[in-house]
Amino acid sequence: MTRDLLARRERQALCDLALVLGEDAPTLSGDWTAKDLVTHLLLREHSLVGAPGLLIRPLSRLTDLEMARIGKKDFTVLVERLRGHGFTPYAIPAVDRAVNTLEYFVHHEDLRRAQPGWTSRDLDRADESALWSAIRVFGRGLVRPAGVPVRIRRTDTGAEATLRRGADPAVLTGMPQEIVMFLYGRNQHRGLGFTGPDKHIEALRTAGLGLSPSRHELLLRPHPAVVSCHDFG
């Protein structure tokens, strides 16, 4: 039996966990709560009014207003709305895989890893490889703030990828899921190793990787979805 895409399974798992933890649960996305996170994801996928502000700074005020409007809805209603793609480009498997694999994995982990006693998940090889394929692409933009050559290496297979070219790179080694969390600027990760020139390692570790919670979609999202924000009522 063919499994759903990792992006779709992570979407469902995020929704399940959000309901268990409740709307006020903390996340690793700045000071966002679980409800803020769910509201943001709905805006990203469904709002013609608010989504452009995630990309275009002068429109960010509209994004804030739309976040506030959507956030007035009942948390359970919002979570169940997020479970489905609706009539958006994200319902297309190729788009979902390209845009949402990291999106929903990172945000699911934002909920998981903000809780006391979290542990890394035992993902199978196929899921780790899906994360690896995605971070090889999006990681190039994520490491720009470091300003140094960067390579990543999987501990399970030994595969390597260059994220920023140059001599004497900082080499980040670990499981793909942990590499993803580090490159998205999350401070909750396990089992990572760093090799290379000390100054390059220091630059990578202190660069403030990832994007701020209000802007972290810039590298992930396609053109705004074609469903009107009025679907939220």
Locations of the language-model features?
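Structured surface interface patches that mediate subunit assembly and partner/cofactor docking
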Residues: M1-D4, V20-D24, S47-L62, V77, ...
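An N-terminal domain-cap segment
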Residues: M1-G53
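Short, charged, amphipathic alpha-helices and their helix-cap/turn boundaries
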Residues: A7-D16, G71-R83
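Context-gated lysine
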Residues: K35, K72-K73, K199
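Acidic catalytic motifs of isoprenoid enzymes
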Residues: E66-I70
